[in-house]
A protein has these predicted regions:
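Double-stranded beta-helix
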Residues: 57-115, 138
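Non-heme Fe(II)/2-oxoglutarate
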Residues: 79-81, 113-159
C-alpha cells in the first residue's frame, strides 16, 4: 500500500489510522453522522485505505459511496466544512455512484478529494479500519501556514 500511495501522491507516508463504526440506530441519519453527506475532505489529494472487519453488504451494510471521476474537480473554497458538502440530487444527477462493499478482510483505497459519503441507509452495522496517507511534508506545511484544515484528520491515532 505504501508503494501505491507514493505512486499516486509522490513520496507519501501513513499519518494515522482509526476504527470507524456506523451503527444501525445511532447513526442512521446525517445529523448524527455528518460523513453521511456527500463531501470531499478539504485537503486536496490524500488517500484513505479502508479494511473491512466483517462483510460489508452493498445495500444494507452502510457502504462508502463515491462519485466516480469527481477527484478531478477543483474546489475554490475549503476552509469551512459546509463548503465541502454537496446535495445528494446533484451528485447522483452528475456522476456515476459506486458502492464500495465486500467481504471481511477486503477493502479499498480512495482519494478523499473525490466526492464520497458513508451511506446512512442500511440495517447492518459497518466497522472498518481507516488508514490515512499524505504527501510527506504536506500536513506540516498546512500547519505552518495556519490553514486550519484537517491534515491529518484530528480523530485518528497518529503513526
Amino acid at each position: 500500500i505504501n508503494d501505491i500511495a507514493s505512486g499516486y501522491l509522490g513520496e507519501a507516508q501513513l499519518s494515522g489510522y482509526k476504527i470507524v463504526r456506523i451503527d444501525t440506530t445511532s447513526t442512521n441519519d446525517t445529523e448524527s453522522y455528518v460523513a453521511g453527506l456527500w463531501h470531499h475532505d478539504r485537503v486536496g489529494n490524500r488517500l484513505k485505505v479502508f479494511v473491512f472487519l466483517h462483510d460489508v453488504d452493498c445495500d444494507e451494510g452502510h457502504p462508502t459511496e463515491v462519485a466516480v471521476g469527481s477527484h478531478l474537480l477543483n474546489y475554490y473554497r475549503t476552509d469551512a466544512m459546509g463548503a465541502s458538502r454537496f446535495a445528494d440530487e446533484y451528485v447522483r444527477n452528475n456522476y456515476e455512484v459506486a458502492k464500495l462493499c465486500g467481504p471481511k478482510g477486503g477493502g479499498f483505497v480512495v482519494d478523499t478529494h473525490t466526492l464520497h459519503r458513508g451511506a446512512v441507509e442500511g440495517s447492518l452495522a459497518r466497522t472498518v479500519i481507516v488508514g490515512e496517507y499524505h504527501s510527506i511534508g504536506k500536513c506540516a506545511a498546512m500547519d505552518a501556514l495556519k490553514l486550519g484544515l484537517p491534515c491529518p484528520s484530528g480523530d485518528q491515532f497518529l503513526v
